[in-house]
């Protein structure tokens, strides 16, 4: 009983005691002893041994150790987070930020605040920049350039550092055109100017010379102007003048230019004799010809350009339509220097017919009076006739309607060899019927004497038969633009 009681008591007591003991031992002994055993764990000691000084929050090393490493600790594995102790989580959800993140070439960490070296414009993190200024000399440490996937080499700069600027992330633009440049600028415009000045300069000289050869072809050949508008000397005139004048224009429309046309309306575009005698001969060939061209545009009488004898001249030999003002064999003739309007003194005319109305526009082959003596231009022997027009017998007293030389050629200076008026003859617009040789009707339009080279046969163009139209009244006496001959009134009654 006692034993049982003891057992029961023991069991009860043991059960109760054991329960109390367990309750006491578990929280006191087990819980209290285990923390004491865990405290001397080596982890805090390892951390303390790794960083002897007070650790930075979030990093396991201080600024000096980080600077002294000079990126060598992270040189082979830069930009990888294996050796970095990040104290924040990266959430890659969201939009991509355009602001680039640069890594410091000294410590290899991302740069939040730049330390910008002036004047070389290289950047490091601001802490490394200040540490470099304190410990190192006043030279830029240079930048790191990637040799291969995991290796980098340092590009030396060695520029003296005057000051260090502090810049926030996103405020600088770094040059990445050339590897190792890494210069930073405060604006995109300055960065582009740096790229154009430093890196694109070599390509510019090759592109510049290309547009240069474009300009020379734009200028017209200088020989074109003298061929068309300036009367060259006889020798040169025979060579290059004919092809243009015989091809470009239709047969020159004959203007009914009997004596009224030559006297008054021709005076409107004819300079005074004083101008003829005073101006030197060589410039006159150019200046007066140019004046002739300009007066044609304003005159109501002459509208035919220089290339008048195109088709008609084609039937003639390709001689110069207008010989020059001065022929070598007649150097001293004074009145010949009027290349465009004045009829040469050697021209012989029949007695003037009743004046037909002046034509203000070119006419196709105006009526040519039959039997009239031809206007002799004394410019040269007539070229051989290849297609002679049918002989016609117009009534006498009419000048053959031939294009006056001032319309297409300057009159020749030398007097005709067949005996024309002397050199000091009256001006060409004065007609002396007595001095004009009268030709027979059987001579036709093919036999006027021509003694000067470059002459033009007046009868080369087939002229319609019939007398020229009669004028209703005397030609208008209203002044017309252009210089007037001072003696114009002297000869006016002759034609009225």
UniProtKB/Swiss-Prot annotation:
Primary localization class, coarse: nucleus
Biased composition (Polar residues): 304-314, 434-449
Stretches for region Disordered: 35-60, 304-496
Source organism superkingdom: Eukaryota
Reaction(s) catalysed by this chain's protein: S-ubiquitinyl-[E2 ubiquitin-conjugating enzyme]-L-cysteine + [acceptor protein]-L-lysine = [E2 ubiquitin-conjugating enzyme]-L-cysteine + N(6)-ubiquitinyl-[acceptor protein]-L-lysine
RING-type Zn finger ranges: 104-144
HYB domain: region residues: 157-215
Keyword vocabulary terms for this entry: Developmental protein, Metal-binding, Nucleus, Transferase, Ubl conjugation pathway, Zinc, Zinc-finger
EC number: 2.3.2.27
Pathway stated in the Swiss-Prot or TrEMBL entry: Protein modification; protein ubiquitination
One GO BP annotation of this record: mRNA processing
GO cellular component term, pick one: nuclear speck
Keyword Translocase set for record: no
Binding partners and assembly: Homodimer. Interacts with tyrosine-phosphorylated SRC substrates. Component of the WMM complex, a N6-methyltransferase complex composed of a catalytic subcomplex, named MAC, and of an associated subcomplex, named MACOM. Component of the MACOM subcomplex.
PANTHER family: E3 UBIQUITIN-PROTEIN LIGASE HAKAI (PTHR13480:SF0), E3 UBIQUITIN-PROTEIN LIGASE HAKAI-RELATED (PTHR13480)
Protein's job: E3 ubiquitin-protein ligase that mediates ubiquitination of several tyrosine-phosphorylated Src substrates. Associated component of the WMM complex, a complex that mediates N6-methyladenosine (m6A) methylation of RNAs, a modification that plays a role in the efficiency of mRNA splicing and RNA processing.
Comment, domains: The HYB domain forms a phosphotyrosine-binding pocket upon dimerization, and mediates as well the recognition of its flanking acidic amino acids.
Family: Belongs to the Hakai family.
Name of protein: E3 ubiquitin-protein ligase Hakai
Organism of this sequence: Xenopus laevis
């Amino acid at each position: 009983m006692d034993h049982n009681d003891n057992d029961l008591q023991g069991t009860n007591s043991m059960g109760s005691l054991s329960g109390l003991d367990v309750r006491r031992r578990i929280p006191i002994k087990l819980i209290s002893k285990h923390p004491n055993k865990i405290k001397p764990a080596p982890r805090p000691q390892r951390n303390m041994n790794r960083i002897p000084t007070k650790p930075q929050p979030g990093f396991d090393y201080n600024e000096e150790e980080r600077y002294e490493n000079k990126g060598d600790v992270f040189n082979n594995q830069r930009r990888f987070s294996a050796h970095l102790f990040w104290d924040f989580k990266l959430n890659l959800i969201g939009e991509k930020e355009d602001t680039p993140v640069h890594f410091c070439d000294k410590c290899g960490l991302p740069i939040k605040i730049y330390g910008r070296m002036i004047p070389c414009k290289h950047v490091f993190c601001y802490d490394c920049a200040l540490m470099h200024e304190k410990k190192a000399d006043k030279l830029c440490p240079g930048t790191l350039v990637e040799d291969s996937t995991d290796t980098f080499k340092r590009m030396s700069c060695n520029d003296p550092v005057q000051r260090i600027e502090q810049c926030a992330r996103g405020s600088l633009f770094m040059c990445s055109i050339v590897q190792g440049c890494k210069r930073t600028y405060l604006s995109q415009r300055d960065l582009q100017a740096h790229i154009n000045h430093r890196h694109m300069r070599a390509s510019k000289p090759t592109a510049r010379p290309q547009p240069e050869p474009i300009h020379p072809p734009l200028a017209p050949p200088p020989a074109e102007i003298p061929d068309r508008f300036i009367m060259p000397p006889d020798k040169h005139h025979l060579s290059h003048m004919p092809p243009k004048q015989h091809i470009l224009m239709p047969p020159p429309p004959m203007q009914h230019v009997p004596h009224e046309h030559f006297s008054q309306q021709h005076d409107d575009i004819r300079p005074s004799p004083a101008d003829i005698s005073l101006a030197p001969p060589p410039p006159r060939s150019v200046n007066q010809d140019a004046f002739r061209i300009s007066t044609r545009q304003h005159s109501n009488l002459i509208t035919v350009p220089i290339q008048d004898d195109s088709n008609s001249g084609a039937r003639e030999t390709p001689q110069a339509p207008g010989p020059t003002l001065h022929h070598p064999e007649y150097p001293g003739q004074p009145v010949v220097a009027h290349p465009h309007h004045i009829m040469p003194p050697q021209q012989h005319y029949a007695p003037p017919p009743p004046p037909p109305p002046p034509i203000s526009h070119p006419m196709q082959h105006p009526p040519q009076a039959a039997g009239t003596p031809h206007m002799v231009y004394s410019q040269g022997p007539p070229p051989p006739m290849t297609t002679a027009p049918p002989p016609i017998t117009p009534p006498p007293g009419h000048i053959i309607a031939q294009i006056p030389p001032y319309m297409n050629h300057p009159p020749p200076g030398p007097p005709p060899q067949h005996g024309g008026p002397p050199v000091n003859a009256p001006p060409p617009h004065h007609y002396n019927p007595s001095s004009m040789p009268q030709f027979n009707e059987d001579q036709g339009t093919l036999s006027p004497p021509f003694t000067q080279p470059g002459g033009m046969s007046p009868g080369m163009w087939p002229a319609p038969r019939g007398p020229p139209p009669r004028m209703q009244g005397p030609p208008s006496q209203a002044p017309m633009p252009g210089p007037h001959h001072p003696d114009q009134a002297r000869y006016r009654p002759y034609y009225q």
